């Protein structure tokens, strides 16, 4: 399983420097099609997207991403990101690791 990152060039640069191979730069108008493409990739286990980009997606796609376990979707960059990550880990593993 691989990590995939979708977002603006500024958002994905750090992930690219860290050696992540599945990097998808996407402008606002391309976001929905790129996210759909990543969701269909069976090699992706964790999908990272900026919270602002996540909020730009249609509600139906946001719901799909929020409920997705494979891949697990993690939003970064907004308020409350720690609790979001905690919930995603709890959802995918089945245990609250912070307790």
UniProtKB/Swiss-Prot annotation:
One cellular component term from this protein's GO annotations in UniProt: plasma membrane
GO biological process entries: proton motive force-driven plasma membrane ATP synthesis
Location in or out of the cell: Cell membrane
Bilayer topology term: Peripheral membrane protein
Keywords of this entry: ATP synthesis, Cell membrane, Hydrogen ion transport, Ion transport, Membrane, Transport
Family annotation (InterPro entries): ATPase_V1-cplx_f_g_su, ATPase_V1-cplx_fsu_bac/arc, ATPase_V1_fsu_sf
Entry's Gene Ontology molecular function annotations: ATP binding; proton-transporting ATP synthase activity, rotational mechanism; proton-transporting ATPase activity, rotational mechanism
Binding partners and assembly: Has multiple subunits with at least A(3), B(3), C, D, E, F, H, I and proteolipid K(x).
Family: Belongs to the V-ATPase F subunit family.
Role this protein plays: Component of the A-type ATP synthase that produces ATP from ADP in the presence of a proton gradient across the membrane.
Name of the protein in question: A-type ATP synthase subunit F
Record organism: Methanococcoides burtonii (strain DSM 6242 / NBRC 107633 / OCM 468 / ACE-M)
């Amino acid at each position: 399983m691989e990590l995939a990152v979708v977002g603006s060039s500024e958002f994905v640069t750090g992930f690219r420097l860290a050696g992540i191979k599945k990097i998808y730069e996407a402008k606002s108008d391309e976001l929905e099609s790129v996210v759909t493409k990543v969701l269909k990739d069976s090699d992706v286990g964790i999908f990272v997207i900026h919270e602002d980009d996540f909020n730009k997606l249609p509600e139906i796609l946001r719901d799909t991403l929020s409920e997705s376990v494979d891949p697990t979707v993690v939003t970064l960059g907004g308020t409350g990101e720690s609790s979001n990550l905690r919930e995603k880990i709890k959802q995918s593993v089945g245990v609250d690791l912070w307790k």
